[in-house]
């Protein structure tokens, strides 16, 4: 992924009312395990994923399903309460913590399924998912799904990424720039699922 696709420059909103009213910050999957003091165990499972015994892999899957189900329910409740954007950041999933092999396994075996599941209620409620630059970078490099990162020109320039997402008709999933970005925004990066068939 090129540096111009993911822009990490950020200024923090001085007036947070628009942000607080519309953006729900959903914990990342690994952050949830950290909150439960089981992150180190999950890290070890991810790093040894391919060589895990079947029963251990099943235990990991049950743990993951429990956390993902809880996060999906939390996102649904937020959307039902009037939030417009589910903001996803999972700093504990970076290569700094997992290494390249672990990050690849995390994106391919865990995160992409979660993202697909989260996309459904967002579409139902007319909401959006925004993915932070770091997580966007991992998806771009390691995702096996047919996902296209596409820059979309907006109908006008906005003063922040948040305003662009809220006031412009863009795809459900946006990525790359930080949700807190302030400055001229006249295009936005969206994630589009390419069709696998020829129809």
What residues fall within each predicted segment?
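Active-site loop segments of alpha/beta catalytic cores
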Residues: 1-199
